[in-house]
């Protein structure tokens, strides 16, 4: 269910675009699917988790701007803005001696601070890379290619996460060595 909420709007957008070949109609689907994903997420969890709220909110804002102005630029730059924001948040947090990824994922993982720092920098670099590549594709390719690229980012993200699993497993605290992590509630 969580995967549907997290990726459903992007997949619905891609399907709508390739069925209709109309970016505006696909943007309507993106906006509606993003709103539905937030509603489903709230209905299931009785709260809006921070990241789905961020992604859904950005899709609603940029999708709505695209519809109002009749331009595909807003939806296309959404990928850049989101990924730059995440990269800045993560890398900036490390520079300020904070552990932003630990706050977000701390309940699920118990890692030493040095491992959190490394993992945070890796995620920050990944998000910065995606933002840069999106700008290259957005500015050099046609809309069909950009939509294919956007859909390809979904499995690429899963592969990136999978490549981090060995590092996380290696550094996970075991048994009595695990510290009880009490990050702030990420829900709203």
Curated annotation (Swiss-Prot):
PANTHER family (UniProt xref): INNER MEMBRANE-SPANNING PROTEIN YCIB, INTRACELLULAR SEPTATION PROTEIN A-RELATED
Topology in membrane: Multi-pass membrane protein
GN (gene name): yciB
Purpose: Plays a role in cell envelope biogenesis, maintenance of cell envelope integrity and membrane homeostasis.
Record's keyword terms, sorted: Cell inner membrane, Cell membrane, Membrane, Transmembrane, Transmembrane helix
Transmembrane regions: 23-43, 49-69, 73-93, 116-133, 149-169
Any one GO CC term of the record: plasma membrane
Protein name: Inner membrane-spanning protein YciB
Organism for this UniProt entry: Caulobacter vibrioides (strain ATCC 19089 / CIP 103742 / CB 15)
Domain of life per record: Bacteria
Family named by the database record: Belongs to the YciB family.
Subcellular localization: Cell inner membrane
């Amino acid at each position: 269910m969580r995967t549907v909420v997290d990726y459903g709007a992007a997949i619905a957008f891609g399907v709508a675009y390739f069925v209709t070949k109309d970016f505006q109609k696909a943007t309507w689907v993106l906006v509606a699917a993003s709103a539905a994903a937030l509603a489903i997420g709230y209905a299931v969890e009785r709260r809006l988790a921070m990241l789905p709220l961020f992604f859904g909110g950005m899709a609603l804002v940029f999708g709505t701007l695209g519809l109002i102005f009749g331009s595909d630029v807003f939806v296309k730059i959404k990928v850049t803005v989101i990924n730059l924001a995440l990269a800045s948040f993560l890398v900036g947090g490390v520079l300020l001696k904070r552990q932003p990824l630990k706050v977000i994922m701390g309940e699920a993982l118990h890692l030493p601070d040095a491992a959190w720092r490394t993992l945070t920098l890796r995620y920050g670099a990944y998000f910065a890379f995606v933002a840069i590549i999106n700008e290259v594709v957005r500015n050099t390719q046609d809309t069909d290619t950009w939509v294919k690229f956007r859909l390809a980012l979904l499995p690429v993200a899963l592969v990136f996460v999978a490549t981090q699993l060995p590092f996380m497993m290696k550094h996970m605290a075991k048994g009595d060595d695990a510290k009880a992590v009490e990050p702030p509630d990420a829900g709203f």
